[in-house]
C-alpha cells in the first residue's frame, strides 16, 4: 500500500515537472495568457481589497433588502460621496497642486543656494579631500545625467502615458469586477469545500470564514487608520502653518498603508516643504507626524485591528524588507495581509489535525472502557 502511494505521487511530481519543462520551451504559446493575466491583476487585486471592505456592509443591508439592491445602494452612496468630495475638496487640491508646481523653481533655487553654502563649508572641503571621493567621477556623472536628460524625459512621458492608460483601465473594470464579487462571492466557500470529504466541509467553511475575517479586519482597519492619520496630519500641518497642508495630508494617508516604513515616506515631503519655508516649520512637521504616529500605534491600531493579526513587529519588518526587494512598494503593501492569511490558514490546518487526532484517540479508547 505504501509503495503504491509513493509510486503514485512520484509519477504526479514527474508529470508536473514535465509540464513545467515543456512550458519553458514553448513559452510563446502562453504569452497571450500571461498578458491577459497581468492586465487583469491590478483590477482584480483592487476589487478584492474593496470586496473585503464593503462585503460586511452588504451582509448588514442584506438583512433588510435583497443582496443585489444592497450592492447598488452602496454604489450610489459611494458615487455620491465621491461627487461631494470632488466638489468640496477638488478645487482646493487643484489650487495647491498648481501652487506647488509654480513654486518648484523657487524651491530648486533654494536647494542650489543651500548646496552652494555647503560647498564652502569646512565639512565639504574635508570630504572632497578624502581619497574615496573623486571630483572627476562626480563631474562625469553629472555630465552624463544632463546629456541623457532629454531621453529620460521622453521615456518618462511614455511611462506616464502607460500609467494613465492602466489607471483608466482599472477605473473602468474594477466596478464591474467588484459588483460580481459582492453579488456571488459569498457562494465561493460553499463551492470550494465540495472538493473535500463531507466530514471535513464544516471545518473547511470555518477556515474560509477565519481567512475572510482576517482580511476584512486588516483592510477595514487600515482604511480607518489611513483616514485618521491623513486628517490628523492635515489639521496639524494647518496649525503649524505649513503650505499645501491638504496635499501633504493626503500623501501621509496614502503612504501610511505601508507599516513602519510608510510614515517616514509620507513625512519626507512635509519636512522638505516646511524647510523651504523655514526650519521651524520643518521641525513642527516632524512633531506633528510623531504625535499622530504615537496616537496611531498606541491607541488607534490596537483598538481598530486589535490582536487580530498577532504578529511581532520584528516579523513585520523582516517581511517588509523581503517583500520590498521582490515586489517593491506593492510587495510591501501586500506583505502583511498575505502573511496573515497564510498564518491563519496553517494555524487552522494544525487545529484541524489536532482535532482529528483527538477524536481518533477517543474512538480508540471507547472499546477499552
From Swiss-Prot:
It is found in: Cell membrane. One of its GO terms (cellular component) is plasma membrane. Disulfide bonds: none annotated. GO terms for biological process: transmembrane transport. It is a multi-pass membrane protein. It comes from the Bacteria. InterPro entries: AI-2E-like (IPR002549). The chain crosses the membrane at residues 13-33, 34-54, 73-93, 159-179, 213-233, 234-254, 271-291, 316-336. Keywords: Cell membrane, Membrane, Transmembrane, Transmembrane helix, Transport. Pfam families: AI-2E_transport. Belongs to the autoinducer-2 exporter (AI-2E) (TC 2.A.86) family. This is Putative transport protein YueF.
Amino acid at each position: 500500500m505504501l509503495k503504491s502511494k509513493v509510486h503514485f505521487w512520484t509519477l504526479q511530481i514527474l508529470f508536473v515537472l514535465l509540464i513545467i519543462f515543456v512550458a519553458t520551451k514553448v513559452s510563446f504559446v502562453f504569452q497571450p495568457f500571461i498578458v491577459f493575466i497581468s492586465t487583469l491583476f491590478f483590477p482584480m487585486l483592487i476589487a478584492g481589497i474593496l470586496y473585503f471592505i464593503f462585503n460586511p456592509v452588504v451582509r448588514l443591508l442584506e438583512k433588510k433588502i435583497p443582496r443585489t439592491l444592497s450592492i447598488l445602494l452602496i454604489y450610489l452612496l459611494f458615487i455620491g460621496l465621491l461627487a461631494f468630495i470632488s466638489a468640496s475638496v477638488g478645487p482646493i487640491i487643484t489650487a495647491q497642486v498648481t501652487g506647488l508646481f509654480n513654486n518648484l523653481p523657487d524651491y530648486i533655487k533654494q536647494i542650489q543656494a543651500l548646496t552652494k553654502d555647503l560647498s564652502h563649508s569646512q565639512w565639504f572641503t574635508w570630504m572632497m579631500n578624502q581619497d574615496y571621493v573623486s571630483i572627476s567621477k562626480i563631474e562625469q556623472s553629472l555630465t552624463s545625467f544632463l546629456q541623457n536628460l532629454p531621453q529620460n524625459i521622453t521615456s518618462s512621458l511614455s511611462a506616464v502615458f502607460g500609467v494613465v492608460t492602466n489607471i483608466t483601465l482599472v477605473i473602468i473594470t474594477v466596478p464591474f469586477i467588484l459588483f460580481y464579487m459582492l453579488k456571488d462571492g459569498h457562494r465561493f466557500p460553499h463551492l470550494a469545500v465540495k472538493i473535500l470529504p463531507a466530514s471535513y466541509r464544516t471545518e473547511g467553511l470555518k477556515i474560509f470564514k477565519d481567512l475572510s475575517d482576517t482580511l476584512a479586519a486588516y483592510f477595514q482597519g487600515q482604511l480607518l487608520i489611513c483616514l485618521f492619520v491623513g486628517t490628523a496630519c492635515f489639521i496639524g500641518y494647518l496649525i503649524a502653518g505649513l503650505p499645501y497642508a491638504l496635499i501633504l495630508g493626503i500623501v501621509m494617508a496614502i503612504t501610511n498603508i505601508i507599516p513602519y516604513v510608510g510614515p517616514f515616506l509620507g513625512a519626507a515631503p512635509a519636512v522638505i516643504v516646511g524647510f523651504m519655508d523655514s526650519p521651524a516649520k520643518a521641525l513642527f512637521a516632524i512633531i506633528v507626524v510623531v504625535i499622530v504616529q504615537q496616537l496611531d500605534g498606541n491607541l488607534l491600531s490596537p483598538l481598530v485591528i486589535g490582536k487580530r493579526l498577532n504578529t511581532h513587529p520584528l516579523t513585520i519588518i523582516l517581511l517588509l524588507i523581503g517583500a520590498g526587494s521582490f515586489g517593491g512598494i506593492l510587495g510591501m503593501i501586500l506583505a502583511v495581509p498575505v502573511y496573515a492569511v497564510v498564518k491563519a490558514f496553517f494555524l487552522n490546518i494544525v487545529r484541524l489535525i489536532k482535532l482529528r487526532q483527538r477524536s481518533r484517540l477517543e474512538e480508540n479508547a471507547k472499546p477499552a472502557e
